[in-house]
Amino acid sequence: MAELLLGVNIDHIATLRNARGTDYPDPVQAAFIAEQAGADGITVHLREDRRHITDRDVRILRQTLHTRMNLEMAVTEEMLAIAVETRPHFCCLVPEKRQEVTTEGGLDVAGQRDKMRDACARLAAAGIQVSLFIDADEAQINAAAEVGAPFIEIHTGCYANAETDAEQAKELARIASAATLAARLGLKVNAGHGLTYHNVKAIAALPEMHELNIGHAIIGRAVMTGLKEAVAEMKRLMLEARG
């Protein structure tokens, strides 16, 4: 079973900063602490409306991170240009709606193959590894393989939001099947969205999982216990699940 990595999403450090229009807390400082605590990478979502992470954050993080930078972004000309200029280690392409609180679902790769193929090729030419944020759906996984993305990130929101044990078990089975299919097609498999200290282990135990990207739960815990301890505890739970 391959090593399981933790990508810590620090968007909500920026949310807190921007709530008062100050220059603190600084996501760059948070990234440094997360790395010290065991994060294998730092994830940020540069949204079109810049509601949390800013261009300045992206630029400085790329220059200062000791691990890997994963830039989440919409598939737009503006964002592709920023990515090509900044050259993060990874880009995760996500759907984006201005009115949403957080990303609500996966990309429709199957319905826009040409657009996704072009984006993947453009980013790959800049030396960036591409991940597509998709639902645990066979058609989307097949399409992801066809357009040339080396990674997918499975949307775990339905699993995380399940209201009953039976519903959660059903969603977990869907994710497990999706991960198996993706691996068979030669894709590396990440996962994220809604994962918490209470539900992460079942996802972490799936042998195909390469990396979990987790943000809100860690930042929420950090308010109570400190960021370093919050990151370390999440990493411990993930590794426990791998035995």
Swiss-Prot record:
Q: Which residues form a coiled coil?
A: none
Instruction: Provide this UniProt record's keywords sorted from A to Z.
Output: Cytoplasm, Pyridoxine biosynthesis, Transferase
What's its catalytic activity? Answer: 3-amino-2-oxopropyl phosphate + 1-deoxy-D-xylulose 5-phosphate = pyridoxine 5'-phosphate + phosphate + 2 H2O + H(+)
Q: What is its EC number?
A: 2.6.99.2
Q: Where does 3-amino-2-oxopropyl phosphate bind?
A: 9, 20, 194, 215-216
Q: Name one GO biological process term.
A: pyridoxine biosynthetic process
Q: Where in the cell is it found?
A: Cytoplasm
Catalytic residues identified in the record? 45 (proton acceptor), 72 (proton acceptor), 193 (proton donor)
The metabolic or biological pathway listed in the UniProt record of this protein is: Cofactor biosynthesis; pyridoxine 5'-phosphate biosynthesis; pyridoxine 5'-phosphate from D-erythrose 4-phosphate: step 5/5
Q: Which family does it belong to?
A: Belongs to the PNP synthase family.
Query: What does this chain do?
Result: Catalyzes the complicated ring closure reaction between the two acyclic compounds 1-deoxy-D-xylulose-5-phosphate (DXP) and 3-amino-2-oxopropyl phosphate (1-amino-acetone-3-phosphate or AAP) to form pyridoxine 5'-phosphate (PNP) and inorganic phosphate.
HAMAP family the UniProt entry points to: PdxJ (MF_00279)
Q: What does the subunit comment say?
A: Homooctamer; tetramer of dimers.
Name it. Pyridoxine 5'-phosphate synthase
